[in-house]
Amino acid sequence: NKSKFDKESSELVGILWNQWENDSKNGNYKVYYKKLLVIIEALRKELNAPDIPIIIGGLGDFLGKEGFGKSCTEYTLINKELEKFAFEQDNCYFVSAEGLTSNPDGIHIDAISQRKFGLRYFEAFSNKDHILKPLANENELVDLICSRDHTKSEKIYMQSMDFALGKISYDEFISQVTKINND
């Protein structure tokens, strides 16, 4: 499988489990723990990494309210199963999605929340600990991240997106990429 192939040229140091909304309806929480245990045990065995840290992200508390997420009313029950799993299994750490916000679709987290969640994941991984509340300084850290200069690759990607979305012409795209590469 791809994970085993990737291990040949890189080091696998952790696994991020981000379930999201799919099982947060129709009583699926009742079998969630058992299903997750089968998956995690099989994954650790297949990768020959029995002690690899698993960082488990909770579901956002914006679910069950509007848009495509309106039917996901059992997200708190899934979160309880995820948290229970992380507390009971070795080298598993739960990361709360408390306070994160969604895109207008009501089901996916927005860009700022993705950054906050990423900071929480990093904190859980680097400290090998559960993150049960928003980080005290996450707003300041997100501001710092967002105010930094973009890398050359990021600048080219943004120009590529503008071109793909028809915001700039091909000639403008080539001109901008050439300028970025020459800076």
Language model features with spans:
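Cell-envelope and extracellular/periplasmic
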Residues: 1-183
